[in-house]
Regions:
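Conserved ABC ATPase "signature" region
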Residues: 106, 110, 117-135
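Hydrophobic anchor residue at the start of the ABC signature
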Residues: 153
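Catalytic Walker B motif of ABC-type/P-loop ATPase nucleotide-binding domains
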Residues: 164-167
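ABC ATPase "signature
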Residues: 222-223
Length: 254
């Protein structure tokens, strides 16, 4: 077993991460690392333990046990340092719906102590790339889900974090918007931002550099999408997941 270390090229290190809620084990001895600049996918069905794990990595929840470092900091003692170096987008897009687009940018930029001029500069750049600069004074609640989703991601990387955590970011949007969102992810990764994304959409695993497949709180497989398909003789990541889920069910029956 290896120990979580600070300076080895990995921005996330977890060794035997466990999270219990009473007698229920949500995360069962998760061990994995995430390399700087990669797109790392946490794939699994709803209830597999993905959101629980991501909340621990973001410093929003304490693990029961295990060694975990994020951006070089221990999750038990340095959560504030971690929060300064990450971006986070939750399943609900993480925006204040009663504020305007610009007010959301200003609010979240202020959390990271960015100067107003820099917030305005980056917000205008992002809105310009999205082709919605004219919507800067629009109230978030008045915008369609696809635009809100893209804005939430833009806000999450406004301060240029080392890592951005995306928890089921494409839920509830159409396939075209999903593809556009992944283009934004690739653009962010190209700038050096590490992307950690949870999803239950099996096709989205194909877009990741590496994928961890969660089944009932455990990591059942971890590799590149191509290698996972070869290992399990599967034509798609959906087939890989089904084979792992069935194997897990058979083991539980024994």
């Amino acid at each position: 077993m290896y120990e979580a270390k600070e300076n080895n090229g990995n921005v996330i290190e977890a060794v035997d991460l466990v999270k219990r809620f009473g007698n229920f084990v949500a995360n069962d001895r998760l061990t994995f690392s995430v390399q700087r600049g990669e797109i790392f996918g946490f794939l699994g069905a709803n209830g597999a333990g993905k959101t629980t794990a991501i909340r621990i990595l973001c410093g929003l929840s304490k693990p029961t046990s295990g060694q975990i470092r994020v951006a070089g900091y221990d999750v038990y003692t340095r959560t504030e340092k971690i929060k300064q170096r990450i971006g986070y987008m939750s399943q609900r897009f993480s925006l204040y719906e009663d504020l305007t687009v610009w007010e959301n940018f200003r609010f979240f930029g202020g959390i990271y102590r960015m100067k107003s001029a820099l917030i305005r500069e980056r917000a205008d750049q992002m809105l310009g790339r999205l082709g919605i600069l004219e919507l800067s004074d629009a109230v978030i609640a008045s915008l369609p889900p696809g635009i809100r989703q893209k804005l939430a991601f833009s806000v999450a990387i406004l301060h240029k974090p080392e890592i951005v955590f995306l928890d089921e970011p494409t839920g509830g949007v159409d396939p075209v918007t999903r593809r556009q969102f992944w283009e934004m992810i690739y653009e962010a990764a190209a700038t050096g931002i590490t992307v950690f994304v949870t999803t239950h959409y099996m096709d989205e695993a194909e877009y990741c550099n590496r994928v961890s497949i969660m089944v009932d709180g455990k990591i059942e497989a971890l590799d590149t999408p191509e290698q996972l398909k070869k290992t399990y003789n599967a034509g798609s990541m959906n087939d890989v997941f089904l084979k792992l889920a069935r194997r897990n069910e058979e083991q539980m029956k024994e």
